[in-house]
Amino acid sequence: MVVGPEGDFYLRPSAAPLLLVAGGSGLAPILALLEEALAAGAQRSVTLLFGAREERDLYALDEISALAAQWRASFHFVPVLSGATSDSNWQGARGLVTELIPKFLENGPHAYLCGPPVMIDSAVLMLRGSALPCDHIYADRFTPHHYPLAATA
């Protein structure tokens, strides 16, 4: 059985700052959320944490720059590489994207998470452990789906 999107990953009305955490291809829904918010005139501050393995895995950087330039409040973008070796030229954050979350919780943000299940689970545990209310945490978990293969003759 194939099930369509349920449509529960959208920006809730609020003036609270946004903490957006994306892992890998989870950036795409986060960008869609930001584009819709920008079109609606949102004026919430944004911190966007984007986790990838290597620098070559970072994508949509021009789109993120354009969004940041048009955003009506502060916009802080932090790419984080989990696979950057000490001998690489990477000057940005290293480690797991979820390890940076505690640095951005001081203003009681609403957290939107999108990416692989292990990232979502880790982020939710961290956010709940920091006393962020559960109704301020929204997640779109990427899970593998197994579809039966058509029989071949």
What are these regions (language model features)?
Residues 10, 29, 122-123:
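Phosphate- and divalent-cation-binding pockets in alpha/beta enzyme and binding domains
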